[in-house]
UniProtKB/Swiss-Prot annotation:
Protein name: Elongation factor Ts
Region (Involved in Mg(2+) ion dislocation from EF-Tu): 82-85
Function: Associates with the EF-Tu.GDP complex and induces the exchange of GDP to GTP. It remains bound to the aminoacyl-tRNA.EF-Tu.GTP complex up to the GTP hydrolysis stage on the ribosome.
Pfam families the UniProt entry points to: EF_TS (PF00889)
Family: Belongs to the EF-Ts family.
GO cellular component, one term: cytoplasm
Main localisation: cytoplasm
Domain of life: Bacteria
Keywords: Cytoplasm, Elongation factor, Protein biosynthesis
Taxonomic source organism: Nostoc punctiforme (strain ATCC 29133 / PCC 73102)
Gene of this entry: tsf
Compartment(s) where it occurs, according to its Swiss-Prot or TrEMBL record: Cytoplasm
Molecular-function GO terms, alphabetical: translation elongation factor activity
Length: 314
C-alpha cells in the first residue's frame, strides 16, 4: 500500500474541497493516486461538499413525521442557504426522510450516524454530503425533537406545518381512554391545537401555572421599572403592575388565547366543550414550535459577491 502523506492529502483537499478524512480515505482506496482519488470522491458525492459546509445555512424547511397510530411524532429543522434549494424536490425528500429517521434518534449526532434508509450502506451524514455536492449548498440538520406517549398513557401526537415549511408545531394531547384517543373528534382537536400554537408566536406554556417563578418575576421587574409608574404611590403601583402581569402571563399561555376558529371562545373553553362531548378529561400535555432560521445570523452578501463566490466555486 502506498504511503499516504499529509502533502498528498492537502493536494487532494485543494483540488476537491473535500474534508481531510474523506481525502485520506479516498487516497487509501486508490493507493495514493490523486486523480483517481478525486474521481472516487466525485462518485461518492463528496467532492467540494467540504468547501461548502462552512457557509451560513439559514433557509430550509421545518417538517414533521407522525408515526401511524399517532403515538410518536417528530419536528425537525434542516437548513440550506437559499429558498431556491429549499423548494428543490431532492431537498424536500431529504428532509422528509430525516424526519422519519429522527423518530429513532436522541440527538443530531446520533441521527447523522444512522444508516440512511434510502441509501443502504451509507450513513445519514454521508448522504447529506452527497446532497451538498449535488445541490451546491451547505445543508445542516439544525435541530429536532421527538414526542412519544409515555408507557401506559393514552393520547395522540399530531403536528401542523405553516407557510410552506417556515413554521412547524408538534403537540401531544392526553386522554383517559383508548376509545377517546382514537376518536376522530379528539384527533381533530389535536390538529387544531397545533394550528393554534403556530398562529400564536408569543405562546410558550400551556397554562399560567406552568410558567416558572423566575419568568414571572422578570416580567414584574420590567413593569415596575416603566417610566409611566415612576410617580405613582407604591400601593397604586403594585395594583397596576399586578394587572399588567396577569395580562402578560396570559399572553404566554395557550389555554388563555382566543380560539383561532371561533374568537368568541378561548382555547380553555374549547377543551371544556370537548370534555363534555367526549365524556372525560383531556389536556394538552406539551407542545413545541420551530420557526425556520430562528436565531441564525444571516450573512449579508452583495449580488456581485455572491456571483463571484459561485464562479470561484466551480
Amino acid at each position: 500500500m502506498a504511503e499516504i502523506s499529509a502533502k498528498l492529502v492537502q493536494e487532494l483537499r485543494q483540488k476537491t474541497g473535500a474534508g481531510m478524512m474523506d481525502c485520506k480515505k479516498a487516497l487509501i482506496e486508490t493507493e495514493g493516486n490523486v486523480e483517481e482519488a478525486a474521481d472516487w470522491l466525485r462518485k461518492k458525492g463528496i467532492s467540494k461538499a467540504g468547501a461548502k459546509s462552512d457557509r451560513v445555512a439559514a433557509e430550509g424547511l421545518v417538517d414533521t413525521y407522525i408515526q401511524p397510530g399517532g403515538q410518536v411524532g417528530v419536528l425537525i429543522e434542516v437548513n440550506c442557504q437559499t429558498d431556491f434549494v429549499a423548494r428543490n424536490e431532492a431537498f424536500k425528500a431529504l428532509v422528509k426522510n430525516l424526519a422519519k429517521q429522527a423518530a429513532a434518534a436522541d440527538s443530531v449526532e446520533s441521527l447523522l450516524a444512522q444508516q440512511y434508509a434510502d441509501s443502504p450502506g451509507g450513513t445519514v451524514e454521508e448522504f447529506i454530503k452527497q446532497t451538498i455536492a449535488t445541490l451546491g449548498e451547505n445543508i445542516q440538520v439544525r435541530r429536532f425533537v421527538n414526542f412519544a406517549l409515555a408507557e401506559g398513557t393514552q393520547g395522540v401526537v399530531d403536528s401542523y406545518i405553516h407557510t410552506g415549511g417556515r413554521v412547524g408545531v408538534l403537540v401531544e394531547l392526553g386522554s383517559q381512554s383508548e376509545s377517546v384517543a382514537t376518536n376522530q373528534e379528539f384527533q381533530s382537536l389535536a390538529r387544531n391545537t397545533a394550528m393554534q400554537v403556530a398562529a400564536c408566536p408569543n405562546v410558550e406554556y400551556v397554562s399560567v401555572d406552568q410558567i416558572p417563578a423566575e419568568v414571572a418575576q422578570k416580567e414584574k421587574d420590567i413593569e415596575m421599572g416603566k417610566d409611566d409608574l415612576a410617580n405613582k404611590p407604591e400601593n397604586i403601583k403594585e395594583k397596576i403592575v399586578q394587572g399588567r402581569i396577569e395580562k402578560r402571563l396570559k399572553e404566554l399561555t395557550l389555554i388563555d388565547q382566543p380560539y383561532i376558529r371561533d374568537q368568541s371562545i378561548s382555547v380553555e373553553d374549547l377543551f371544556k366543550q370537548a370534555k363534555t362531548k367526549l365524556g372525560e378529561e383531556i389536556q394538552v400535555t406539551r407542545f413545541v414550535r420551530y420557526i425556520l432560521g430562528e436565531g441564525i445570523e444571516k450573512q449579508e452578501i452583495s449580488f456581485a459577491d455572491e456571483v463571484a463566490a459561485q464562479m470561484g466555486g466551480k
